[in-house]
């Protein structure tokens, strides 16, 4: 049984998340979303997605892919810093109070736990290991940058 069951987005708290901080996809979800939208993964990434970053308990900053946040004129297909992610921004797929990709929404969004903050952190930590070097490779090439994966037992740099 999945420790993080799929939930409905039919409450104000879930919709508030769509206006602040979009959830992360699992790597295998992105090709399925691209196919559903009839575009290549590259076109989807450059037009609707972004690389997000999260900070692990050991201090490592690691990357994963999320919907682009509409804010400050920042372009899709780029990397968001922790500071940028701290400011609210509407998910590119949230329109007129609804998720336009509901059936294909990010893993994290489908399991939103706004009422259980500790579990929400555990949910993100479940997603992070799926963003391996291989899973991030294509997106790293598209943003022309080095993206970080979580490396347990790696010592934090001072």
Residue ranges and their predicted role:
Residues 1-158:
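Short loop/turn segments that flank or connect secondary-structure elements
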